[in-house]
Swiss-Prot record:
The keyword Transcription applies. One of its GO terms (molecular function) is DNA binding. The gene is solR. The keyword Cell cycle does not apply. GO terms for biological process: quorum sensing; regulation of DNA-templated transcription. It comes from Ralstonia solanacearum. Residues 169-234 form the HTH luxR-type domain. Gene3D superfamilies: Transcription factor LuxR-like, autoinducer-binding domain (3.30.450.80), Winged helix-like DNA-binding domain superfamily/Winged helix DNA-binding domain (1.10.10.10). Residues 193-212 bind DNA. Keywords: Activator, DNA-binding, Quorum sensing, Transcription, Transcription regulation. Belongs to the autoinducer-regulated transcriptional regulatory protein family. This is Transcriptional activator protein SolR.
């Protein structure tokens, strides 16, 4: 069944929260011929363990098994999506570390699948996956999916981000002044407070005043963390 993209766009835009939006995404996935749908978003922070949000209609128990087995860290679909926005067709790799992933997926009824990634200005990475238990993909279907998934993945991620990013990356809500951004940029260049003061023609005390304000706004413990957070969220 060919989706009505105009109606879908309206339904997406009027979704009141991320859960309603995902239900609309899953409905389009079914119209495209896929039993199952998954949308995952990975935030740029925390750096050591980025926050992740996952929504899915997979068979009961699969996502719990996926997460408990640490498949997210070895999933070649995620790896491919992180480096390319092209249509990804399962299986992406038959490397030894992913062999169990594909085997377990087939056992769960996830035999055929495609995925498409996208990014937002805040550095959030999104991956949309469509899957089914049977019916191999044809060349004609892949041609259709190349267009449909590009539209669906990008719109889904664009509209999901305003729901998810403020929750998972509260630093993204920070509003920095022009001077605070300048001080952060020069800090990122390795300049000391004294040197930044000379460059901006302000006192060292004023530089430190702006730095302290930034630390509070970004919930950072030091200047290094503040710069990392600001870059990761697109604030500078």
């Amino acid at each position: 069944m060919e989706p009505d993209f105009q109606d879908a766009y309206h339904a997406f835009r009027t979704a009141e929260d991320e859960h309603q939006l995902f239900r609309e995404i899953a409905a389009i996935a079914r119209q495209l011929g896929f039993d199952y749908c998954c949308y995952g978003a990975r935030m740029p922070l925390p750096v050591s363990k980025p926050a992740v949000a996952i929504f899915d209609t997979y068979p009961a128990g699969w996502m719990q098994h996926y997460q408990a087995s640490g498949f997210l860290d070895i999933d070649p679909t995620v790896r491919a999506g992180a480096s390319s926005s092209d249509l990804i067709v399962w299986p992406v790799s038959i490397r030894d570390d992913a062999a169990r992933l594909w085997s377990d997926a087939r056992d769960a009824g996830l035999n055929i699948g495609v995925a498409r990634s996208s990014w937002t200005a805040h550095g959030a990475f999104g991956l949309l996956t469509l899957a089914r238990h049977a019916d191999p993909l044809t060349a004609a279907e892949l041609g259709q999916l190349s267009i449909a998934t590009h539209w669906l993945a990008n719109l889904a991620h664009t509209l999901m981000s305003p729901f998810l990013v403020p929750q998972l990356v509260p630093e993204s809500n920070a509003v920095l002044t022009t001077r605070e951004r300048e001080v952060l940029c020069w800090t990122g260049e390795g300049k000391t407070a004294y040197e930044i003061g000379q460059i901006l023609r302000i006192s060292e005390r004023t530089v430190n005043f702006h730095v302290n304000n930034v630390l509070l706004k970004l919930a950072a413990t030091n200047k290094v963390q503040a710069v990392v957070k600001a870059i990761a969220t697109g604030l500078i």
